[in-house]
A protein has these predicted regions:
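Amphipathic, alpha-helical segments enriched in basic
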Residues: 1, 16, 41-48, 58, ...
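A general marker of short, structured functional hotspots
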Residues: 7, 20-21, 35, 63, ...
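Residues in flexible loops and secondary-structure boundaries
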Residues: 9, 14-15, 30-34, 64-67, ...
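Intrinsically disordered, low-complexity N-terminal regions enriched in serine/proline/glycine
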Residues: 23-24, 38, 52, 74
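Mixed-charge, Lys/Arg-enriched low-complexity segments
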Residues: 48-91
Length: 91
């Protein structure tokens, strides 16, 4: 079963000056009938009526590592479009 928890929100402006609202989520999957946990991330971006998101489940089984990743994603205002590239560099 997958749970999703909001960890960070961030308000920035795009290069064109348009307000952009970002939300960073922790994805938590129970494995082996609840005996193990696996963590991932999801980013939601909203500008006006438009929304886009990207999520990558099951990145790590270490809780401290995923929180470090989510903190860094929010700090650097990573968007859904760049999540895959950033994660490849992080791994």
């Amino acid at each position: 079963m997958r749970n999703k928890s909001l960890i960070h929100t961030k308000h920035i402006k795009t290069q064109e000056g348009t307000p952009l609202h970002l939300e960073y989520y922790l994805l938590n999957d129970s494995l082996l009938d609840g005996c193990a946990e696996c963590y991932g991330v999801e980013i939601l971006a909203q500008t006006g009526e438009a929304q886009c998101y990207a999520g990558i489940p099951r990145i790590t089984m270490r809780g401290t590592r995923i929180f470090t990743l989510i903190d860094q994603l929010a700090y650097f205002a990573v968007t859904p479009d760049s999540l895959q590239d950033v994660l490849q560099d992080w791994l």
